[in-house]
Curated annotation (Swiss-Prot):
It is found in: Cytoplasm. Homotetramer. The keyword Lipoprotein does not apply. One of its GO terms (cellular component) is cytoplasm. This is Nucleoside diphosphate kinase. Coiled coil: none annotated. It catalyses: a 2'-deoxyribonucleoside 5'-diphosphate + ATP = a 2'-deoxyribonucleoside 5'-triphosphate + ADP; a ribonucleoside 5'-diphosphate + ATP = a ribonucleoside 5'-triphosphate + ADP. The gene is ndk. Major role in the synthesis of nucleoside triphosphates other than ATP. The ATP gamma phosphate is transferred to the NDP beta phosphate via a ping-pong mechanism, using a phosphorylated active-site intermediate.
Length: 140
């Protein structure tokens, strides 16, 4: 398996409850290194651009409002098979379907407030990383 990078967001429901450290520990326990991280307050406009792929979906406006409702932590994670590993550690989108021990099983409040976002493919990871980080901010 190749060394790769993926993008992650610790969402407002998790930052409100001060879960950043616990979530980061899950990533690190899975062998993922945090090579860039910053806490930001995303604007609704930033969320709208970031989640543009969902613009036609009924939950889009609510998602953008939620993502702008409190600070988030944007991150770049690195490791062997980082994209798949991160998705495994996060668990299913619906916390009711998430495997025990995953981030969403332990911390998510609902399908909408599910604590974390993670890239689903190398192409989206590259786009999402570039949206929030410059190359100089990625320290491997």
């Amino acid at each position: 398996m190749a060394l790769e990078r993926t993008f992650s967001i610790i969402k407002p429901d998790a930052t409100r409850r001060n879960l950043t450290g616990k979530i980061n520990a899950k990533f690190e326990e899975a062998g993922l290194r945090i090579v860039a991280q910053k806490r930001i307050h995303m604007t609704k406009a930033q969320a709208g651009v970031f989640y543009a792929v969902h613009a036609e979906r009924p939950f889009y406006d609510e998602l953008c409002e939620f993502m702008a409702s409190a600070p988030v932590v944007v991150q770049v994670l690195e490791g062997e098979g980082a994209i798949a590993k991160n998705r495994e550690v996060m668990g299913a989108t619906n916390p009711a379907d998430a495997a025990p021990g995953t981030i969403r099983a332990e911390f998510a409040e609902s399908v909408g407030e599910n604590s974390v976002h993670g890239s689903d493919a190398p192409e989206t990871a590259a786009e999402e990383i570039a949206y929030f980080f410059s190359g100089m901010e990625l320290v491997g």
